[in-house]
Regions:
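Alpha-helical segment proximal to the catalytic Tyr-Lys
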Residues: 117, 160-164, 227
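Active-site loop-to-helix junction immediately N-terminal to the catalytic Tyr of the SDR YXXXK motif
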Residues: 92, 137-145, 157, 185
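Active-site helix of classical SDR
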Residues: 112, 147, 155
Length: 245
């Protein structure tokens, strides 16, 4: 994709400190975008950065306002931030379920509320990172999966509601991407190497996804190249979704 595709555009990337978010930041910058970053820990790589807890509407609003002062109004939001606690459906108490929803669903909503006013009347692109688990059940991930399913439905509805302002909303649903979060899940297994290999074998293409795989798709959805796409969920799964149907 040519540099002109993102030249002059201002993007905000959440979850930017590592994994998919960090790859998105580097990719958008390489294609000419001005990128601001937001995470719950300090992140680098962008023209401006802020720290905020997505559980707090006030913190999110203040952080986005701070970033806007540095880079201007936002044309693009790529929302990668989220949490993924493990535990059975009945094991998690109400507080944990609500915490997952506060970060993974309401956190995304808070980001939309913060950036959509910038895009009204001039258009924009919003890319939300979901998960294959929104469609295919995995034992031990009930709260996470339910939150990602809710995120996808919220995105589809927002796509319809914002289409009149030419604000596009799309979702990426990755399978296993080799990020620090996934590596931590392998480390908790009795045999981490075996757990990793078993996970690889679930993907017909024979490997885990990389953060760069996700970043390239996010770049396409953020750019004018995808100008007639909204309300879509893109499977980024190495074929895993085909074998699990």
């Amino acid at each position: 994709m040519s540099e002109a595709a993102m030249q002059g555009r201002v993007a905000l990337v959440t979850g930017a400190a590592s994994g998919i978010g960090a790859a998105v930041v580097a990719t958008l910058r390489a294609e000419g975008a001005t990128v601001a970053t937001l995470d719950q820990v300090a992140s680098s790589g962008g023209a401006a950065s802020a720290v905020a807890d997505l559980r707090s509407p006030e913190a999110v609003g203040a952080a986005v306002a701070q970033l806007r002062q540095h880079v201007g109004s936002f044309d693009v939001l790529v929302h990668c931030a989220g949490i993924c606690p493990s535990g059975s459906t009945l094991e998690h108490d109400d507080a944990l379920w609500m915490d997952v929803y506060s970060v993974n669903v309401l956190g995304a909503l808070r980001m939309l509320r913060a950036v959509v006013p910038d895009m009204r009347g001039r258009g924009g692109s919003i890319v939300l990172v979901s998960s294959i688990n929104a469609r295919f059940a995995t034992p031990g991930l009930a709260a996470y999966a339910a939150s990602k399913a809710a995120l996808e439905e919220m995105a589809r509805t927002a796509a319809l509601e914002l289409a009149g302002d030419n604000i596009r909303v799309n979702t990426i649903a990755p399978a296993s991407v080799d990020t620090p979060m996934l590596q931590a899940s392998f480390a908790r297994a009795a045999d981490p190497a075996a757990a990793r290999q078993a996970n690889v074998q679930r993907h017909p293409l024979g490997r885990l996804g990389t953060p760069q795989d996700a970043a390239e798709l996010a770049l396409f959805l953020a750019s004018p190249r995808s100008g007639w796409i909204t309300g879509a969920v893109f499977a980024l799964d190495g074929g895993a979704g085909v074998t699990r149907r």
